[in-house]
A protein has these predicted regions:
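N-terminal, polar/Ser/Thr-rich
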Residues: 1-27
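Asparagine-centered strand-capping/turn motif at beta-strand->loop junctions
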Residues: 23, 37-44, 52-54
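Short, charged loop segments at secondary-structure junctions
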Residues: 82-96, 282-299, 307-310, 314-320, ...
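Exposed beta-sheet edge/beta-hairpin loop segments within beta-rich domains
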Residues: 109-117
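Von Willebrand factor A/integrin I-like adhesion domains
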Residues: 215-217, 418-465, 579
Length: 675
């Protein structure tokens, strides 16, 4: 890792030394605190800038900064006000920490005026609900922000921030520099280590505890409690830490948690779906499979995705219709329209897949529109299946596009060990489908089994949904602002979480209705809303986070480009301030009272990420505007893929973006002088 000076030249070792993660899991709730330790090895003060991931469902509600034993509690402010206070602290020589949210799963930690030889610790805390399926809970802590492909035209005057990687903003992704941290070459450590400790209190007997991608140590305190630690403290942080733990081989009952304090009453219901019963739904289906063949999917990711897709094709019935779409810098469609799943058409599909390799950019929007476009098949249920790592900068724009096509069901497959879960989860949520994640690099047999399991689960969900057409009757209980507003269908043995507020103490019965295997389904659940309950205070943060997610869904396009509807921005900001939550419009700021580093402005330091496991350096390609080459000498800017001149009337349609090495540019244009 290197400190970068104001001209972007290397200046020394990066200050991030260690990240410590401690999680407390109680039932389906987790409180997680990560402490980032920064140290200045230089003889001049520095400012560290670190882009890092957090779970997309997390409600970040606490920040503290430790400067030489002085602990400063962070305050939540409007983003522009927090940035003003941070700039003032920098000018005055005070240590300060600023935490910004760029996406629900990407954050920026800036620490300014770190004196020579000093250590500053910043602790960030969040709460989240844990996914649960078939008797198993899952806790995930992401460790890497993967490279993003940035579509669009470079915005006028959108040069890179001097603290950020050299990625200019575009008309589609104006904040590109804040979601694309620098990356180390594949397999190289970024210079800091990570420790993880998860304390589990399941409340019921614990069964097997496993981690898909890391070695762990497990200490069992009792039959329902355990402490799990990451064993490989010096492992390269290039993949998500995913912990799964079974609970007693028993069916978890519906659960109601409530909290009522000064801000009123809040509740969360975890509603279990019915068991899978009845025959398959054999209604003819129109399935469109979409495969990401961009550079970031090169190698094992795309081969795994192709394996999943081939297995999925084998599960088609002859009365089903299907089509295949692939995308990278451009979009390829196998058939003009969906065709019957005959042996001959399936053979053509497998031949089409055979030659696909990962290369080029990730122009995902074209594929989204092609896959979701209306067809004439009125008697077929439309199901679209995307297989991708989600490494794009215009993720919110893509989710907004899916919103505009409510007739299709969207199922997403995340292929890789550190994919963009925000995009993949939201694609499935807005498309009323489900997300599936397929891990890599666990050995040939395990990777093959994972692909087969993913294909099997896909058809099980599509052909035998557990519960559809869900509605809730609160039966007079004093509840309000309940989310989600549109209840999803349940395709797998995952619970439905409902969160809301209540205005007064009450007890009663709520009724859950729906369709299970074509028959009417009814479940009655006793609900107790207490007059006072100090426990479960995190429910207020979870409700506010869910409310913010609902507001974001009202203007994904504006959030993407920075032109948000005023009422949406103001309501998100109000919730962030009232509930001390991170949002795109509210930030945490902590400023030391003591002037410890007066004098000149600090040297700024960008902290690089490890390259995601399974992904090669330079894999994220890009698409330039078509240019005609007219001269014999030219200069190419490798940080933005801009072409200064052209050469010998050659036409170049596709060029890699900032992740490509200069030598690769030289191969594209003879006689080029890469810069």
């Amino acid at each position: 890792m290197r400190i970068l000076d104001s001209q972007g030249k290397p200046g020394g070792l990066c200050p991030l030394k260690h990240t410590d993660v401690k999680a407390e899991v109680s039932g389906f709730l987790a409180r997680v605190t990560l402490t980032q330790e920064f140290h200045n090895p230089r003889d001049e003060k520095i400012e560290a800038v670190y882009h890092f991931p957090l779970p997309q469902r997390s409600a970040v509600d606490r920040l503290t900064m430790d400067v030489g034993g002085r602990v400063i509690r962070g305050e939540i402010k409007r983003r522009e006000e927090a940035e003003r206070l941070f700039a003032q602290a920098r000018k005055e020589g005070r240590v300060a920490a600023l935490l910004d949210q760029e996406r629900p799963n990407i954050f920026t930690q800036s620490v300014t005026s770190i004196p020579p030889g000093a250590t500053v610790k910043v602790a960030i805390s969040y709460v989240e609900t844990l996914p649960y399926e078939d008797g198993v809970y899952e806790f995930t802590f992401p460790m890497v922000v993967g490279p993003r492909y940035i579509p669009g035209k470079t915005a006028p005057g959108a040069g890179p921030d001097d603290a950020e990687p050299a990625t200019a903003g575009t008309d589609q992704v104006p904040d590109a520099a804040r979601i694309t941290p620098p990356h180390m070459p594949t397999g190289m450590r970024p210079g800091h280590d990570v420790s993880v400790e998860v304390a589990i209190d399941a409340g019921v007997p614990l069964e097997q505890i496993t981690s898909e991608l890391h070695e762990i140590e497990v200490d069992r305190d009792s039959n329902h409690q355990a402490v799990v630690r990451l064993k490989e403290k010096d492992a390269i942080p290039d993949r998500d830490f995913t912990l799964r733990f079974g609970v007693g081989g028993m069916q978890i009952a519906d659960a109601v948690l409530a909290h009522r304090g000064e801000r009123g009453g809040y509740f969360t219901l975890m509603l279990q779906p019915p068991n899978r019963v009845g025959a398959e739904d054999v209604t003819p289906k129109e399935l469109v499979f979409v495969l990401d063949t961009s550079g970031s999917m090169g190698g094992l990711p795309i081969e795994t995705a192709k394996r999943v897709m081939r297995l999925a094709l084998e599960g088609l019935y002859e009365h089903d219709t299907f089509n295949l779409i692939t995308f990278s810098g451009d979009t390829s469609v196998l058939f003009d329209k969906p065709v019957p799943a005959t042996k001959d058409n399936l053979r053509k599909a497998n031949q089409f897949l055979e030659g696909k390799r990962g290369d080029g950019g990730t122009e995902m929007m074209k594929a989204i529109r092609a896959a979701l476009a209306d067809t004439d098949a009125q008697d077929h249920i439309r199901i679209v299946c995307f297989m991708t790592d989600g490494y794009v900068g215009n993720d919110m724009e893509i989710v907004g596009e899916i919103q505009r096509h409510p007739k299709a069901r969207v199922f997403s497959f995340g292929i890789g060990n550190s994919v963009n879960r925000f995009l993949l989860d939201k694609m499935a949520e807005q498309g009323r489908g489900e997300a599936e994640y397929v891990f890599l690099n666990r050995g040939d047999q395990k990777d093959t089994e994972a692909a087969a399991d993913a294909a099997r689960r896909f058809y099980e969900r599509v052909r035998s949904p557990l519960l559809t057409d869900i509605s809730v009757d609160w039966n007079g209980l004093p509840v309000e602002d309940v989310y989600p507003k549109r209840l999803p269908d349940l395709f797998s043995a995952k619970p439905l979480f409902i969160t809301g507020r209540y205005t007064g103490a009450a007890s009663g019965v709520m009724r859950l209705r729906g369709k299970a295997a074509g028959a009417d389904f009814l479940r009655e659940i006793n609900v107790d809303l207490p007059d006072s309950e100090e426990r479960h205070d995190a429910l207020a943060s979870l409700w506010a986070r869910t409310r913010i997610d609902d507001l974001m869904a009202q203007d994904y396009g504006g959030l993407q480009t920075g032109n948000v509807k005023k009422d949406v921005e103001e309501e998100i900001t109000r919730l962030g301030l009232d509930y001390r939550l991170m949002t795109q419009f509210t930030s945490f700021i902590a400023v030391d009272d003591v002037v410890t580093a007066p004098g000149e402005a600090p040297q700024r330091a960008a902290v690089p990420m490890a390259m995601p496991n399974g992904m090669r350096m330079g894999a994220v390609g890009g698409l330039s505007e078509s240019v005609v080459v007219t001269s014999s000498v030219e200069t190419i800017n490798t940080s933005s893929a801009e072409i200064a001149t052209t050469i010998e009337h050659r036409r170049l349609d596709e060029l890699p973006l900032n992740m490509r090495q200069a030598t690769e540019f030289a191969k594209l244009v003879a006689g080029a002088a890469p810069t």
